[in-house]
Amino acid sequence: MTKKIIFTGGGTAGHVTLNLILIPKFIKDGWEVHYIGDDNGIEHQEIKKSGLDVTFHAIATGKLRRYFSWQNLLDAFKVGFGVMQSLFIIARLRPKALFSKGGFVSVPPVIAARLLGVPAFIHESDLSMGLANRIAYRFATTMYTTFEQEQTLVKLKHVGAVTKVTAPKSRSVASKQLAAVSEYFDPNLKTLLFIGGSAGARVFNRFITDHPELKEDFNIINISGDPSLNELSRHLYRVDYVTDLYQPLMEMADLVVTRGGSNTLFELLAMRKLQLIIPLGKEASRGDQLENAHYFTTRGYAEQLLEQELTLPHFQEKVREVFAKQSDYLSAMTSSSELQSPESFYQLLSADISSATKEN
């Protein structure tokens, strides 16, 4: 009988990336792979775009809120209906395991898996659990964490950051793929790369537009998320979205200015890139990026600048500070043991699935 596994997770790219790394490994080992998600979510888009042999199952999903809202009543029904749909899907497929990367859409499948006796493994990328994973943890077999957790919960297993990004061996790849960009850049200037999520990038976009004098001191790469800003000119390259050029652009940069999303932070750690973190504040998030940024700064991996302090003088001061302490940051990143390869995590997950299946 063919072994089956169900993946779930979505809402943002960060809740899909690890799944897309793991799925090909399961397929290669003969597993039949299914995915439960939102038909209109980024997870469905990414699965279709990947071309992987995955069967997608759409369920109803509702947003979980920590505050009172009449919308909670409607969304509670959506979540309940999502659980019923997930029960039907899982009962029909009879998978050996379910793996969840989080997000609101993942809660119903995890609950359904527990009710049907299917081992459910979940992954938490942030220093503190989001509401969806707080709920899912109660129904999970194991929760893998990227960060060392202060909580001593029995089902937690710290694995570090799972990333396929590695430190560059040379810049030859970047120079070949980005020859056109290099023609507009001054080799005597440091190169800064700005990257943020869909919402987080807007502050960077506006900052670069409002301060054209940045181009006098630096080459600027701006991954903007906005195609109307695309531009290649003297000391400036603005592009809305990159895939194959992502790592070459990173390698081209001397310093990366980023938000506080854990996936990007750990990718930069894996590449040993100098980074200045400008996290989303609590007015735009639940505060997880502030926690992630604090974790990185206290370990000497990066420097932080709060968004409300993002003025040109403050920014220039922080950039100078990072470059002045470059050797300290690189030493801390080089000695870090917080990274794990996709293959090693796959082996760990496979072993845990086998163990949980035997127990059942």
Swiss-Prot record:
Pathway(s) per entry: Cell wall biogenesis; peptidoglycan biosynthesis
Molecular function per GO: undecaprenyldiphospho-muramoylpentapeptide beta-N-acetylglucosaminyltransferase activity
Reaction it catalyzes: Mur2Ac(oyl-L-Ala-gamma-D-Glu-L-Lys-D-Ala-D-Ala)-di-trans,octa-cis-undecaprenyl diphosphate + UDP-N-acetyl-alpha-D-glucosamine = beta-D-GlcNAc-(1->4)-Mur2Ac(oyl-L-Ala-gamma-D-Glu-L-Lys-D-Ala-D-Ala)-di-trans,octa-cis-undecaprenyl diphosphate + UDP + H(+)
GO biological process per UniProt: carbohydrate metabolic process; cell division; cell wall organization; lipid glycosylation; peptidoglycan biosynthetic process; regulation of cell shape
Residues that hold UDP-N-acetyl-alpha-D-glucosamine according to the record: 12-14, 198, 289
Location of this chain's protein in the cell: Cell membrane
Stored HAMAP family: MurG
The name this protein goes by in its record: UDP-N-acetylglucosamine--N-acetylmuramyl-(pentapeptide) pyrophosphoryl-undecaprenol N-acetylglucosamine transferase
Organism annotation: Streptococcus equi subsp. zooepidemicus (strain MGCS10565)
Gene from which this protein is expressed: murG
